[in-house]
């Protein structure tokens, strides 16, 4: 695991809260970054397939700041680290891995989620994350197969997902992520070009 993508405070928080998160798994950008090592990530996003009582979990966590708290959803801060705890019914397609007594979604499950995230909000970090998987791990065709395996029965509009892969307007105004990988291939213009140049492959892979 690439712990150098996290701050010292984030690692301390992860250690402190792990005893209370037996029903949760870490995913999102941080879950991916600690497996690929491609960028710095500041937030810790946890998901549970089991409904949970927000008040009970908050009592155990004792965060410094509560941002949102309702049934199945908590957003809070501890030592300046943003934490999210969400009830998310969608099952994982691959076994979780263990890191510091925490369950972490496999990078392949997070890859599928990155397609979905891009279709919903298209943040620059999400584009970079999916790009990192495609540069470092698998082909476009394999990534599309992973997405279908995870979400084929979920009712997600695959045409919308496809169009979102080349819609960069919202991402353009966001800051660049802090990367641990260097080179012209990792510049934002190269990331955009990759998706544009491979859109036919994505179309074939997503719309089978």
Locate each region found by the language model:
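Compositionally biased terminal segments of proteins
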Residues: 1-208
């Amino acid at each position: 695991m690439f712990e150098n993508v996290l701050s010292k405070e984030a690692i301390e928080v992860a250690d402190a809260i792990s005893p209370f998160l037996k029903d949760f798994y870490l995913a999102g950008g941080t879950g991916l970054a600690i497996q690929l090592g491609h960028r710095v990530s500041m937030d810790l996003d946890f998901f549970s397939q089991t409904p949970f009582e927000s008040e009970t979990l908050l009592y155990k966590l004792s965060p410094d700041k509560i941002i949102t708290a309702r049934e199945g959803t908590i957003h809070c801060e501890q030592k300046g680290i943003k934490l999210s705890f969400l009830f998310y019914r969608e099952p994982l397609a691959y076994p979780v891995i263990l890191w510091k007594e925490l369950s972490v979604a496999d990078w392949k499950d997070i890859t599928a989620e990155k397609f979905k995230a891009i279709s919903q909000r298209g943040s620059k970090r999400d584009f970079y994350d999916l790009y990192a998987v495609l540069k470092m791990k698998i082909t476009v065709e394999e990534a599309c197969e992973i997405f279908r395996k995870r979400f084929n029965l979920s009712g997600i509009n695959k045409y919308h997902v496809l169009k979102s892969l080349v819609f960069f307007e919202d991402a353009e105004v966001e800051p660049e992520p802090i990367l641990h990988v260097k080179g012209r291939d990792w510049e934002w213009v190269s990331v955009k070009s990759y998706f544009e140049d491979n859109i036919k492959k994505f179309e074939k892979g997503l719309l089978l």
